[in-house]
Amino acid sequence: MTSSDASGSGALAGLRPRLPSPLCEVDDARFGRRGVRLLLKRDDLIHPELVGNKWRKLAPNLDEAAGRTVLTFGGAYSNHLRATAAAGRLLGLRTVGVVRGQELAGRPLNPSLARCAADGMRLHFVDRAAYRRKAEPETLAAVLRAADAEDAYVVPEGGSNSAAVRGCRALGEELAGHADVIAVACGTGGTLAGLAAGAGGGVRVLGVPVLRGGFLAEGIRALQTGAFGGPRGDWSLEERFHFGGYARTAPELEAFAADFEHRHGVPVERVYVAKLLYALVALAEENAFSRGSTVAAVITGRPFPEQNDWSGLGPGPARRPLPRERGRAGGKGRGGETGGHGLGVPPS
């Protein structure tokens, strides 16, 4: 799938995504003094509401849905639910969000779920035990019946299925020839699975999981097999930077994200992007990237309005758009280590 394919067809194309997304270089002394170039792949600028990898994963699924109700899954702070709800509003599609945690049904909606509801998504809460079994056919059928959505087009949690993985392949194709290492934060692994397939030979793709547990590699291999028939690309995982798990943080991560925003004028989403950038700075300090190499970080999302403001997302003086030419050849990232983050704020 090419970048034009990933933009979708029909009504999706009418939403006018910005593809390919901008690729910009930032001047960061923590990389520069080690002879490493840092690029930001600004997927957060693809669309104001269907941001980054959410666009790349949702577009092919919405095409396949062909106007049917779209049902998907997520937690109370799911970026995926928000993107699906926004897509439904923009395209006039009915959406149903199956939310983990029956106990939430009687409580006021948090800002994330309130936004989903405002965008027209019908929320259906299920207990956590059933949610864990949602991939089992009998459990899924029961959930669909209870949600009065038996004819819905089902998109898995995080949006990662074969269609989504093939959609994310265009991200790798857009970056091919520009970097020696491409790094992306990982939730369900679908973005990395497609990115690695599109990046081509001679490029190392590094995933930074935001969940703990060390289970992601098997899932990525399964996603690539489903989408492409087998493994694709040279990829690895750097598992030290989850900060305790999904949507969990620490004072040093918040301080780092605020500092990065101040240095470069780039809004930093906290659940995924902050952990990715923190990991890359820490790895640079460990001399994990060879002198003369180019590292591209995929900015898969932006802070939501309750976290930050949409203003200021355009190109700024610290973010130079790159010409379409190959970055310097050189090193590869180091991945596959496990454990907690165990680090303070990377040195300035």
Model feature map: region roles:
Residues 326-328, 333:
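A cross-taxon signal for low-complexity, glycine/charged-rich
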